[in-house]
Amino acid sequence: SNSTFIGIIVGSVAFAMMRLIDILYTWRVDTVLTNAAFSFVVRVVFFCFVSALFSFTSASLTLIEPTAAGAGVSYVVAELNGVSSPKAISLKSGIVKMIGTIFSVSSGLAVGPEGPLVHIGAIIGSAFARGASGRHQWRVMGDSDFRDIVSAGAAAGLASAFGSPIGGVLFSSEEASSFWSHDTTKRALLCSTLAVFVLAALNGSIGKPFGLLQLDFAEEEKHWELFELGPFLLLGILSGILGAMVTLAVSKLARYRLSSKFGRVSEATAVTFMICLTQ
């Protein structure tokens, strides 16, 4: 069925993206850390230049297809709630999104592939929903079936991002979709399970652990003590205040941001370069 193929393809795409991100990121960092033949200044310049180049490439791709910018989850939610945006769930947008995500994450920016994978999963589902009869195939198969398949694709995307089939189904049902049925649940669960299984199998083929939840940022098991609750609460309060201040500052500074296409690309490149100087 469509759900089977969607799950397999989403899992394969997620593996390919994460593998390429790992290769590019590792090459960028290891070249600086291990190449002692060049001076420290040369290595820093190389590090910043490559990071800025990756960011520039990613930002420039959005000029080809503007709907590929950002996480893309809002487009998926809009499509599943009756607001049609054919460009946002087109294969062109999906291809640009995949390439752009690989370069933006590899650049070292504080971004990840999780949101884009939801968008990409929905696009893959949309492609199967359209089928071989052209771009308006969903009008023949019915709006409800079209939404079901796109919902299943979005669920598979999130499931492959976090390694959680149930999480993908819950996200699609609670956050993305306004219309839900037992058939949608079965399709979404099948897609999500297959996507996670394929991703785990492909990771196992290159020597990574198969069948276990892996957190790249936590290699060792840690236990907290009761007396640490106080500092945890204080940290949460301070983080909330800091987050509110950052949000307010961003909203105030947004009016001064460059609105031209060249300006937006230059801004992303400059931000990446400045971040690299602090790493």
Spell out what each predicted region is:
Residues 1-279:
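Alpha-helical transmembrane segments and immediately membrane-proximal extracytoplasmic
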